[in-house]
Design a protein with these regions (language model features):
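Surface-exposed loop/turn motifs in large extracellular/passenger domains
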Residues: 1-12, 16-43, 51-72, 80-104, ...
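The feature encodes a structural signal of leucine-rich repeats
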Residues: 77, 109, 176-177, 201-202, ...
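Alpha-solenoid ARM/HEAT helical repeat scaffolds used for protein-protein interactions
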Residues: 131-132, 174
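Short glycine/serine- and acidic-residue-enriched loop/turn motifs that recur at repeat junctions
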Residues: 77, 133-134, 280
Length: 286
């Protein structure tokens, strides 16, 4: 299937302020997208709307073998999964073998997840930005490729996995590639390379006022050539564990060439090479 240069279709009875330009999967729906291309689906949003560029899904959704190129919206330039809107059951977004390139939004350049469980496997996120188009300026432009936020409708923590995926050349204010502030997060066998944050977390930002609401595990992953003023690769203020991972040539203008940690951090069997000004800036004992 090909979805090219669309703007708000298949809304059903939903408000005009919601929905993707190509597909809108409502609360009771189940969406399956396979071997499809989404290109130039751009929502020129106005102040106060909640639109994304290509797909909005509230129900369960599976996306595989597809391409999202140059889509744009407010929350999630390519996909927005808003399971927190569900009244009866939690939802899950599953994405595999899919490419996200040149997408943009004010918040989450490619994929925005709000209260949905998620599984992202064998995907590529390249050159996505959380600075977007339009006339609305939020307080923070987070997650160049991905943002995960909010608990489920039932106030339960969401769970998510990212595996075998590559994040390259993405840019945002906080979390150049990805930003998380809710749930149990597991990242394995993934690469974060040449991502940029203009504030904190060149590759990834993990941040929440209540540390119990966000727990992080990273295993067998690489962070190479990422940059930010603070925390060249990872910024975290929550309970985090990193194992069997590599941090190479990451840089921060101020502190934390590879990692800036302000909570409980465990690092095991990992390699740090040529990170500047120092590998880890840590306010608590490792």
């Amino acid at each position: 299937s090909v979805f090219d240069s669309n703007d708000i279709v298949n809304r059903g009875s939903a408000s005009v302020d919601y929905g993707g330009a190509a597909i809108y999967n409502w609360k009771e729906g189940t969406l399956k997208v396979t071997n499809s291309n989404f290109t130039n689906n751009i929502k020129n949003y106005k102040n106060g709307d909640n639109l994304v560029g290509a797909i909005t899904t509230i129900g369960n959704a599976t996306v595989s073998g597809s391409n999202f190129v140059n889509n744009s919206g407010r929350w999630g330039g390519a996909i927005s999964a808003t399971g927190a809107e569900l009244r009866k059951n939690s939802s899950t977004l599953t994405v595999s073998n899919t490419i996200f390139k040149d997408n943009s939004a004010l918040y989450a350049g490619a994929v925005y997840i709000w209260g949905s469980n998620y599984n992202i496997a064998d995907c590529v996120f390249d050159n996505n930005t959380a600075f977007g188009k339009g006339n609305m300026t939020p307080n923070n432009n987070n997650g160049g490729a991905l943002v995960v936020s909010q608990v489920s409708r039932f106030n339960e923590p969401i769970t998510g996995t990212i595996s075998g995926s590559k994040f390259t050349n993405n840019k945002a204010q906080y979390g150049g590639a990805a930003y998380f502030n809710k749930g149990f997060v597991t990242i394995t066998d993934s690469v974060f390379e040449n991502n940029i944050a203009t504030a904190e977390g060149g590759a990834v930002g993990f941040s929440h006022a209540s540390v119990k609401d966000l727990v992080v595990s990273i295993n067998n992953s690489s962070f190479v050539g990422n940059k930010a003023p603070v925390a060249g690769a990872i910024f975290t203020n929550v309970d985090s564990k990193i194992t069997n991972s590599n941090f190479i040539n990451n840089s921060a203008a101020k502190i934390g060439g590879a990692i800036c940690n302000v909570n409980d951090l465990t690092v095991e069997n990992s390699k740090f090479v040529n990170n500047t000004p120092q590998a880890i800036h840590n306010s608590k004992e490792l």
